[in-house]
Swiss-Prot record:
Motif (DDXXD 1): 100-104
Positions contributing to Mg(2+) 3 binding: 463, 467
Assembly and binders: Hexamer.
UniProt gene name: EvVS
Protein name: Variediene synthase
Family: In the N-terminal section; belongs to the terpene synthase family. In the C-terminal section; belongs to the FPP/GGPP synthase family.
Binding site for substrate: 100, 186-189, 230, 234-238, 325-326
Sequence segments annotated as region (Disordered): 349-374
Binding annotation for Mg(2+) 4: 463, 467
SUPFAM superfamilies per record: Terpenoid synthases
Keyword presence, Ribonucleoprotein: no
EC nos: 4.2.3.218, 4.2.3.219, 2.5.1.29, 2.5.1.81
Biased composition (Basic and acidic residues): 349-366
Amino acid sequence: MSQSSDFILNSTLSSVVERSTPDIAGFCSGYELRRHHHEHLANEGSLRCRTDWEQFIGPIERWGSCNPWEGHFGAVVLPFCKPERLAVICYIFEYAFLYDNVVESAAKSTLNLNTDNIALDETEYRTVRSILGTKQIQSKMLLELLSIDAPRAEVVINSWKEMISTTAKKDKTRAFNNLEEYVDYRIIDTGAPFVDMLMRFGMGIMLTQEEQKRIEPIVKPCYAALGLANDYFSFDIEWEEFQAESDKTTMTNAVWLFMQWENLNAEQAKRRVQEVTKQYEQQYLRNIADFAAGEGKENIKLQTYLKAQGYQVPGNVAWSLRCPRYHPWLCKEAASLLHQDTIQELEAGRKPQALEEYRSRSHSESDLSDASPTFWSGSCRSSARSSVSSAFGPPDKDISITPAILGDEHLLGPAEYISSLPSKGVREAFIDGLNVWLVLPDHRVNQLKSIAQTLHNASLMLDDIEDHSPLRRGRPSTHMIFGTEQTINSANFLLIDVMEKVRQLDDPRCMDIYLEEMRNLFIGQSFDLYWTRNGECPSEEQYLDMIRQKTGGLFRLLTRMMVQIAPVQQKGLETQLASLSDVLGEFFQVRDDYKNLTEEYTGQKGFCEDLDECKFSYPLIHALTSQPKNVQLRGILQQSRSAGGLDVPLKETVLSHLRQAGSIEYTEAKMGELMEKITDSVVSLEGETGSPNWVVRLLIHRLKV
């Protein structure tokens, strides 16, 4: 794979690594190896991740993606990554390498459900810290990706979600009958498609759905070669662990499988894996050549992408030759070399934040001895296997509703339907964010998420009936399928079911909180319904007060309950957190009003549906109060009440009046004001607690319009 002038890969970002043989340890014949000129940024990303890991999760127990000899994993696998994107991608690589055993083992710890409500025992604390820390780091990663390039970041996030949903269903102990079956499994297990999406993000490449379908069969041999090479180089350390653990009966490694399939010893099986890996490598080269000579002859974009993808193959092999992850006896020497390289970077004038933190730590808290591992010298002994997919666990499972004695299919049918519809997951993310400060055990967090989801679903079912709304999240509203009466019955049951869930929190004060906030919520809803039915336009302050009662009620309910049952009492934060909940509720509703007028949202819920429902939204209230003599606008709204809705031309006329009144800009300004309050509140809470909250920051970023 020599460089061709027909491609637009930026060769100034990396250099060819010269070698004396046409292959690399028997692999990669015909492949060119390159190393990124900005490798210090790759090391910076890894170092920053390790710093965050120690802060949010705990001591580092394993080696990551750095290699002082052949180069950082990201520097040799992604030699054409834009320099400004290399650090965050290598942060993600480092997280994936660190995650496998540390958080996995912590997640298997059993929570002591008999502990009191004042403090966590050690096992529970370590588990909660791992779960919270993982969410913090993942949120920080996503936030940085989104802030750099939101459209391509969304592609990465969607790939992440797909990987989670796919790998969660995979049986790690399954038996494989042949190589093809195993390769299909291993491609997903290693997270190769996800790494591919990270490469695209790094280069700023975006493929259409049609282009994605065209390249999938072309790149499959590349994915296969990457996974099998990983098996080859990681086998020795995995084999040692396998023999030491008597309870294991199988290995997810191609070398092991060839030992079983063909009755080979380990060395013979490794040679077989090398043979088939080389076959996949050469197949990928042929695929690229055939594409460039045939259907893709004029498609420089896809040729560039396929060429860049191919550089992962030699980069992965070269990195594997002496990476301490696969060769634990090299840990000490590698740590020393990386320490020297880091100091040289500082002396050369490159002083990013993480390197400064490294210098501070190396002068105080840690050294390079075995007794006190630095960022670089974590143990290499545990699970050397590289599996990006395992680093991103499946989403939390919701607590199911207890079946009724006489059968619950009619009672829960509407509830199950509304629960199956797409959801933004805002309230669940809000709980995760608050828990960074409150540190509730995971079973309590899941209980609160179940309360939030159940209560929200009940609210949606009743709201759609009261608003005469035919759509919910782009699908028919619940009452349009099950009928009004059955939907009301199901929603009412959910309110009772929530009371049972609150009771299970084992704190009587939580039931008081539930009743208080439910009363507030129903009062707020009563005003909304009254204004709509009687055509009485509220003032802006009245409307915002209604939002605080209604929309903010659920946020406030969750906040107060979390503070109440927090293992470390945080009563001093209750006022600040309640204020954050109120402002977030205001922003959420004003944002919803605004998005109801945009094409993106109306595709889900119906074009300007608020006008059909005769609801007074924030922009409409501004227009009516700022232009009290606008008889045309008032006439159209009266027509909506009489006719039960408006046709599209009349809705467009209303939008025109809103624009003329400056109501759209006024709403945007209000959202900006509320977002500033939210941000200030978060910064204040971070200062008060001493804990940065990347989960909340990511939530805020995703809510911005």
